[in-house]
């Protein structure tokens, strides 16, 4: 990787989407309602070759706040809230069964949060069974994954997940430095994480991911490299290394972070450059803009074939799935729509009590949206673009259709961050760090409203 010129590189740091969707969530509107979703379900059920399903269930509860967290979370220690939530999940599942063909193949299954393991093992088992009763056709090679908070993870949890077929776990690690953990209100010693990982390995979990974050308060380059040394001792299969997005105007808990302790933009770039170098020397290859995988991992092998896909859960080797969002605030996705459930638990419950799917908002994609989504997701996933694949799928002349956008990429070429070739273009190793910036050139919705987003660097 070329050495970063920090003065020149800093010019690229500006607010921009992470492109877990296109159009992005700020474009979701309330005129996409329950009837819109039912129509989308009908259309997808009646495709000549219906896509496999990906089930995402949001389990929103946490006992206490982690100050860095941007997830949709409800803080509670009340058992009755969890019991009540399970009853409403069952109501939603019953409505989904009537609204779509739930006998279609399920290729992916994911629990996110919140803290999924804040639910007791019997409760997790009850939730999983309820979902499997409605969506019974699990594929033989299904990916079943769960987010794990090591502070709330027991052998009984692991046994339940194992019995239900879970084969992937993602551990929230963030940073092993105690001073960083204190500043973000999340204390979890290395030994605690080590014990949780050993438990997962003992049960034969085939894929273990760690979530790490750089840009947190009290972080330094030296300190984060020490965290990475500890990470290597635990030998995860994959790493997601996120750039901390400090958006206190969006997430109130972030206001508890002392901003004077946050690394400067230059310091963050130094951390990023050093972590990429460190991990690549340790045989972890960079995937997209924020993931790493061992060179024999399926993610890296898919990247080599330009077959990676990106969705709200991150990067995947599954080519095309229809995501069904279950639970408060969860997001669903089809080939030409996005939908989101109510973010407020009260309104989520009220809709279900009235017998309605709890749709708060969404967006139906135009043909141009679908085209641009494909371009942006290819860029975000594979850090390159083959024009012919887009031309064949959408019957367009790529260079003519995106003449203005390609002109906007030329400064990146001149800076040595991107190269054009006979097939299309490809980002350099350093240019891949700016994939969000380059993808923004193809975003038809950006019109000075970038204040909604975190900075790209």
From Swiss-Prot:
CDD domains: Radical_SAM
Subcellular location(s) per record: Cytoplasm
SUPFAM superfamilies with a match to the protein in the record: Radical SAM enzymes
Cofactor: [4Fe-4S] cluster
Keyword RNA-binding: no
Membrane spanning residue stretches: none
Radical SAM core domain boundaries: 47-279
Pfam families found in the cross-reference section: HemN_C, Radical_SAM
Cofactor note: Binds 1 [4Fe-4S] cluster. The cluster is coordinated with 3 cysteines and an exchangeable S-adenosyl-L-methionine.
UniProt pathway: Porphyrin-containing compound metabolism; protoporphyrin-IX biosynthesis; protoporphyrinogen-IX from coproporphyrinogen-III (AdoMet route): step 1/1
Residues annotated for [4Fe-4S] cluster binding in this entry: 62, 66, 69
GO cellular component terms, A-Z: cytoplasm
Residues the entry annotates as binding S-adenosyl-L-methionine 2: 68, 114-115, 174, 186, 211, 245
Group of enzyme by EC: oxidoreductase
Catalyzed reactions: coproporphyrinogen III + 2 S-adenosyl-L-methionine = protoporphyrinogen IX + 2 5'-deoxyadenosine + 2 L-methionine + 2 CO2
GO-annotated biological processes: porphyrin-containing compound biosynthetic process; protoporphyrinogen IX biosynthetic process
Keywords carried by this UniProt record: 4Fe-4S, Cytoplasm, Iron, Iron-sulfur, Metal-binding, Oxidoreductase, Porphyrin biosynthesis, S-adenosyl-L-methionine
Gene3D superfamilies documented for this protein: 1.10.10.920, tm_1862 like domain
Molecular functions (GO terms): 4 iron, 4 sulfur cluster binding; coproporphyrinogen dehydrogenase activity; coproporphyrinogen oxidase activity; metal ion binding
Family: Belongs to the anaerobic coproporphyrinogen-III oxidase family.
Oligomer and partners: Monomer.
Function: Involved in the heme biosynthesis. Catalyzes the anaerobic oxidative decarboxylation of propionate groups of rings A and B of coproporphyrinogen III to yield the vinyl groups in protoporphyrinogen IX.
Protein name as catalogued: Oxygen-independent coproporphyrinogen III oxidase
Native species: Helicobacter pylori (strain J99 / ATCC 700824) (Campylobacter pylori J99)
